[in-house]
């Protein structure tokens, strides 16, 4: 095999959005269906961030017949003035990597899922067409980008007399990048329903013009309803437990329930409305706090004697269904990778461990009549003793 030459001329510098098109997997994980939907999540998450900031209470997602998608919210709208670079601010956001208002506490968001500032630009880079429409400050701004952002149309700005504000983004994934450009209605419904569960009162509507279907999601009781939807039809030891509070700048919500028949554990966690499918420091802290609370209580009530070893965490969590929903300020937020599947914030471990240990322990002491059967079941199971039937 002939040797290939390697000289100075072989060194390439990929600038701007060209780098995203060259290596899309670095930004969205893959170019299959999962990566395709990741584009939609990037735009939806920007609208979710407006809701997290208390600036939006409605999000509309529309899948068009040509498999383009439109996401609209009634938030503040992306700023439309001139950026210090001399370009329109929306153009900077959609055509420049690492541009946005989510890098520090002085920006427009105290809490958000958009940590890296590449989401909107990545969507532009991997789409054949992107259209941006913004209503803000008595103006309506419109701009169109084509061919992965390589063609930038001049913006149009007109006076707007209405009271409605917000951002509307339409994009069409580039078939030259993706192995499929067909959005899956069921995947989108599941994700939007999750988001509505996580922000009490937020209304999210999904219209799919391909099928002529429309779905609306809104939940006044938040993750309690989320938990109930996951445990519906199952026998359990107790009603759903719900705890909320703040530790180390981190806002925490936990809903949990122990089933009397289920095996294994089902823990679903979210950080700033991002589903952390691979877990992270918050789940580690949750498990540690739960294990400590159970063992402390078991010894206090003498379910465990001095000679007995502690219950193992895996035994305690058997039959557990839990929803963990936390919000972390941008100043300490750390995800492992652009796809944000795993939390890396160190403070989350200690925050969740102390919070869960305290709240679960508090609940045990003051409402123990609801959980005594759980402890009896766990201890008997660990000792391989015969189980009494539980309802």
Could you say what each language-model-derived stretch is?
Residues 34-57, 119-124:
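Conserved ATP-binding N-box helix of the HATPase_c
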Residues 43-56, 68-74, 78, 384-391:
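Core mixed alpha/beta domains of very large multi-subunit molecular machines
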Residues 2-9, 67-89, 100-229:
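GHKL-type ATPase core
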Residues 153, 186, 193-195, 201, ...:
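GHKL/Histidine-kinase-like ATPase module
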Residues 1-41, 92-94:
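Bergerat-fold GHKL ATPase/HATPase_c domain
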Residues 57-63:
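A conserved short beta-strand within the histidine kinase catalytic ATPase domain
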Residues 76-79, 83-100, 144-161, 183-190, ...:
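Extended active-site and interfacial segments that coordinate phosphate-rich ligands
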Residues 313-379, 383:
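Extended, well-ordered alpha-helical scaffold/bundle regions in very large, multi-domain proteins
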């Amino acid at each position: 095999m002939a040797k290939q030459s390697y000289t100075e001329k072989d060194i390439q510098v990929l600038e701007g959005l060209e780098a995203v098109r060259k290596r899309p997997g670095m930004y969205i994980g893959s170019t299959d269906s999962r990566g395709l939907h990741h584009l939609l999540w990037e735009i939806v998450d920007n609208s979710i961030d407006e809701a997290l900031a208390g600036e939006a209470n409605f999000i509309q997602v529309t899948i068009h017949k040509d498999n383009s998608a439109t996401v609209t919210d009634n938030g503040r709208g992306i700023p439309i003035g001139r950026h210090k670079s001399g370009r329109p601010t929306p153009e900077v956001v959609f055509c420049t990597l690492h541009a946005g208002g989510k890098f520090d506490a002085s920006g427009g968001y105290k809490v958000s899922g958009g940590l890296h500032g590449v989401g909107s630009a990545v969507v532009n880079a991997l789409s054949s067409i992107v259209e941006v429409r913004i209503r803000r400050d008595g103006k309506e701004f419109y701009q169109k980008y084509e061919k992965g952002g390589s063609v930038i149309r001049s913006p149009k700005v007109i006076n707007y007399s209405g009271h409605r504000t917000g951002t509307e983004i339409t994009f069409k994934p580039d078939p030259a990048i993706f192995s499929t450009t067909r959005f899956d209605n069921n995947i989108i419904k599941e994700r939007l329903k999750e988001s509505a569960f996580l922000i009490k009162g937020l209304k999210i509507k999904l219209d799919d013009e391909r099928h002529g279907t429309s779905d609306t999601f809104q939940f006044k009781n938040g993750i309690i309803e989320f938990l109930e939807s996951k445990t519906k039809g199952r026998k359990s030891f107790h009603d759903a437990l719900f705890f909320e509070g703040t530790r180390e700048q981190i806002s925490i919500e936990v809903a949990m329930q122990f089933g009397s028949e289920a095996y294994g554990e089902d823990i679903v966690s979210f950080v700033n409305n991002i589903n952390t499918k691979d877990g992270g420091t918050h789940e580690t802290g949750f498990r540690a706090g739960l294990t400590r609370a159970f063992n402390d209580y078991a010894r206090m009530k003498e379910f465990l004697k001095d000679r007995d070893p502690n219950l193992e965490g895996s035994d305690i969590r058997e039959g557990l269904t839990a929803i963990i929903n936390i919000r972390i300020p941008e100043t300490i937020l750390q995800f492992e990778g652009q796809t944000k599947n795993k939390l890396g914030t160190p403070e989350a471990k200690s925050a969740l461990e102390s919070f869960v240990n305290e709240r679960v322990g508090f609940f045990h002491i003051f409402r123990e009549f609801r959980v005594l059967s759980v402890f009896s079941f766990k201890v008997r199971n660990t000792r391989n003793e015969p189980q009494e039937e539980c309802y």
